[in-house]
């Protein structure tokens, strides 16, 4: 009887969620949210949040390229480029660059400075509030990353001998369940954590960088208690000089549909056997409202199923 009640509750919640989605007014854009496109194609978005003056200033640069754009001979290039970037001063003097990275992460919610995936590379900076000087330096650094890196045998060797601060998405590309999901997908041969093949050819990395790191394939996002107009002007001044245009479309990452079957996966990552029920949900971060709705509905279903199983076990 209890299980029937929970199933009815889950069904009601799902129907309410669906009905609410249909009947709700369309979301209106936040008037504080500004966006634009520079003449070279770079897209920018700025959100001023004066109502949250103590929040840190979040800066993100997304480049629409990742390991899926690599050929077999280029394996590891997409991971190596941000490693090279993190060892250079990015148009700043050494003291400025050191200060930027010392203050450029949130100690309460730390993020990797760069995350490389199959189809994107994300540069992350979290700056203290009321530090317009640091924001200006951050934009200068990211503009340098976007098209002015120095890639030579010396800079490559220096990067490879330094600590690897670049993370991947998914975080563990060798994890058993993820490897199972990759079956039948082109992603299988394009691991974003793959190291460079030896011997390393810096000229080929430079050519890859110039081909895929083009401003028309980049999006810059700045959020915080900032002067939006001033930041927009600074973006135009700092990033407007970048050159290059994407001539080859980047491959689109896709996974095969998840089959309804039971599988056994062996791994050393857990000490106790684990029973999991997995949904065929998108693996990429949520970027649009339809994906958010699917996530909410799946989350309600998961919660109802958890209640039911917990009740049966107790």
Question: What residue spans do the PLM features occupy?
Answer:
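Acidic/histidine-enriched alpha-helical segments
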Residues: 97-100, 148-168, 227, 246-259, ...
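Scaffold signal of the M16-like zinc-metallopeptidase fold and its non-catalytic homologs
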Residues: 138, 166-215, 275, 279, ...
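M16/insulysin-pitrilysin zinc metalloprotease superfamily fold
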Residues: 87-91, 125-159, 312
């Amino acid at each position: 009887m209890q299980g029937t009640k929970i199933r009815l509750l889950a069904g009601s919640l799902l129907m309410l969620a669906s009905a609410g989605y249909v009947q709700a007014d369309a979301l209106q854009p936040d008037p504080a949210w500004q966006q634009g496109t520079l003449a070279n194609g770079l897209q920018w978005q700025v959100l001023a949040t004066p109502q949250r003056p103590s929040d840190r200033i979040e800066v993100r640069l997304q480049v629409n390229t990742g390991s899926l754009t690599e050929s077999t001979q280029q394996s590891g290039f997409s991971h190596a480029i941000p490693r090279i970037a993190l060892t250079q001063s990015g148009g700043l003097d050494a003291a400025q660059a050191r200060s930027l990275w010392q203050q450029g992460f949130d100690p309460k919610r730390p993020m990797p400075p760069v995350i490389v995936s199959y189809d994107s590379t994300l540069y992350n900076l979290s700056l203290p509030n009321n530090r317009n000087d640091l924001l200006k330096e951050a934009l200068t650094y990211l503009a340098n990353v976007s098209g002015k890196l120095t890639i030579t045998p010396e800079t490559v060797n220096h990067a490879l001998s330094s600590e690897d601060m670049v993370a991947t998405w998914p975080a563990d590309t060798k994890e058993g369940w993820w490897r199972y999901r990759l079956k039948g997908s082109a992603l299988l041969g394009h691991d974003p954590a793959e190291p460079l093949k030896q011997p390393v050819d810096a000229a080929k990395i430079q050519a890859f960088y110039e081909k895929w790191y083009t401003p028309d394939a980049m999006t810059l996002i700045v959020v915080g208690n900032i002067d939006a107009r001033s930041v927009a002007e600074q973006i135009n001044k700092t990033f407007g000089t970048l050159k290059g245009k994407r001539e080859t479309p980047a491959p689109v990452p896709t996974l095969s549909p998840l089959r309804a079957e039971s599988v056994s996966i062996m791994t050393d990552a857990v000490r106790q056997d684990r029973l999991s029920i997995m949904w065929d949900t998108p693996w990429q971060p949520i970027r649009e409202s339809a994906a958010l709705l699917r996530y909410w509905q799946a989350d309600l279903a998961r919660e109802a199923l958890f209640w039911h199983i917990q009740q049966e076990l107790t």
